[in-house]
Amino acid sequence: MVMTNILCQILSDDLPELPPCREPSKGMIVGNLGMTSNTMTTEGPFAKLDVESVLSFMSPSCTLRSFPSSLGKPALQTKEESKADFQGLKDFFYNFQLRVKDGAEPVIDEPARKVVLHIEGKGDSLVGRFETEYVYILQINEEGTMVEDFFQFADSATRDAWGKKIEAHFSARN
């Protein structure tokens, strides 16, 4: 039931497959992310690019796995190693917002404590608007308050195209 409450903080309360939501507890994952309904608010840590807050929903031993390998990121990072990646976003983005993609229902396996989400990300950057998609697979701790393992599969074509724009931007400045 705890995972359902976490997801109710992400998703609208009118999803028929979920039991009615209880009042979220203070330490729940999505509350830490600044999510309401099915979107992370403009006041949330992703929008503000507040690195400590973004990582606050990960347990101290959380691992982050990023795919596809063509992105050139290490296949496995610790929470501490992930900090530099998130910090680097502040150099390029003015804001960044994540939301569950319209029409994409989450996959929730409470006994296994796993959640699968299809996410869309949008933000304003040095080189214009950035829009992308991710699939997140989250392994949640027994209390339902922290992510123990964070698997993300990113849209590599969009990221590559945006990376080329960033390179061109900095080349033009030099």
Swiss-Prot record:
Q: Which domain of life is it from?
A: Eukaryota
| Protein's GO biological process | austinol biosynthetic process; dehydroaustinol biosynthetic process; terpenoid biosynthetic process
Q: What happens when the gene is disrupted?
A: Impairs the synthesis of austinol and dehydroaustinol and accumulates (5'R)-isoaustinone.
Identify the InterPro entries for this entry: Fungal_Meroterpenoid_Isomerase
Other noteworthy facts: In A.calidoustus, the austinoid gene cluster lies on a contiguous DNA region, while clusters from E.nidulans and P.brasilianum are split in their respective genomes. Genetic rearrangements provoked variability among the clusters and E.nidulans produces the least number of austionoid derivatives with the end products austinol and dehydroaustinol, while P.brasilianum can produce until acetoxydehydroaustin, and A.calidoustus produces the highest number of identified derivatives.
Quaternary data: Homodimer.
Please give the PANTHER family that the UniProt record associates with this protein.
Answer: AUSTINOID BIOSYNTHESIS CLUSTERS PROTEIN F-RELATED, AUSTINOL SYNTHESIS PROTEIN F-RELATED
Protein name per the record? Austinoid biosynthesis clusters protein H
Tell me the name of the encoding gene: ausH
